[in-house]
Amino acid sequence: MATIYFSSPLMPHNKKVQAVAGKRSTLLGVAQENGVKIPFECQDGNCGSCLVKITHLDGERIKGMLLTDKERNVLKSVGKLPKSEEERAAVRDLPPTYRLACQTIVTDEDLLVEFTGEPGGA
């Protein structure tokens, strides 16, 4: 079970939700199930409108997570994938700070997910 805190300037306070790991749910899906309004358009990782900033709350216990070529290209195009994080993702499968909520699969890690409420803003 993962605890996910959603945070946005448009929300009066952070929303804490529990998510089942292994269900193959995306962050966007978990947000929608819990009334959190992360902006989105395509839900396929092409547009970048569901950009979020993720902070892992489990310290050093960050799990590997595949960054697809599609997501990598979108993050690079919006300037949210520094070279150091791109290399870390490619070599060690460690996730970058910014992700697309529609492409990020929920695991058993506790997360803080921040978004501005504007499409593509994080």
UniProtKB/Swiss-Prot annotation:
UniProt cross-references to InterPro entries, sorted A to Z: 2Fe-2S_ferredoxin-like_sf, 2Fe-2S_ferredoxin-type, 2Fe2S_fd_BS, Beta-grasp_dom_sf
Regions crossing the membrane: none
Gene Ontology BP annotations: nitrogen fixation
Places the protein is found: Cytoplasm
Region of interest (N-loop), residue spans: 59-96
Cofactors demanded by this protein: [2Fe-2S] cluster
A GO CC term attached to the entry: cytoplasm
Induction: Expressed in nitrogen-fixing and non-nitrogen-fixing cells, although transcript levels are higher in nitrogen-fixing cells. Expressed during log and stationary phase growth (at protein level). The gene is monocistronic.
Keywords for the protein's UniProt record, in alphabetical order: 2Fe-2S, Chaperone, Cytoplasm, Iron, Iron-sulfur, Metal-binding, Nitrogen fixation
Keyword Chaperone: yes
CDD domains membership: fer2 (cd00207)
Residues reported to bind [2Fe-2S] cluster: C42, C47, C50, C102
Main localization (coarse): cytoplasm
Positions of the 2Fe-2S ferredoxin-type domain: 2-119
Comment on bound cofactor: Binds 1 [2Fe-2S] cluster per subunit.
Disruption phenotype: No visible growth phenotype, but shortly after entry into stationary phase the nitrogenase subunitsare destabilized and are no longer detectable. In vitro nitrogenase is highly sensitive to O(2).
GO terms assigned for molecular function: 2 iron, 2 sulfur cluster binding; metal ion binding
Consequence when changing K15A: Decreased protection of nitrogenase
Keyword Transcription recorded: no
Family named by the database record: Belongs to the adrenodoxin/putidaredoxin family.
The protein's assembly and partners: Homodimer. Forms a complex with nitrogenase consisting of 1 MoFe heterotetramer, 1 Fe protein dimer and 1 FeSII dimer; the interaction is electrostatic and disurpted by increasing NaCl levels.
Domain writeup: Has mobile N-loop (residues 59-96) that changes position in a redox-dependent manner being folded against the protein in the closed reduced state, protecting its [2Fe-2S] cluster, or away from the protein in the open oxidized state. The open form complexes with the MoFe and Fe subunits of nitrogenase protecting them from O(2).
Function description: Binds to and protects nitrogenase from irreversible exposure to O(2), in what is known as 'conformational protection'. Shifts nitrogenase into an inactive, O(2)-tolerant state. Exists in 2 states, an open oxidized state that binds and protects nitrogenase, and a closed reduced state that probably does not bind nitrogenase; cooperative oxidation of the 2Fe-2S clusters causes the conformation change. Does not protect nitrogenase with the vanadium-iron subunit, not clear if it protects the iron-only nitrogenase.
Name of the protein described by the UniProt record: Protein FeSII
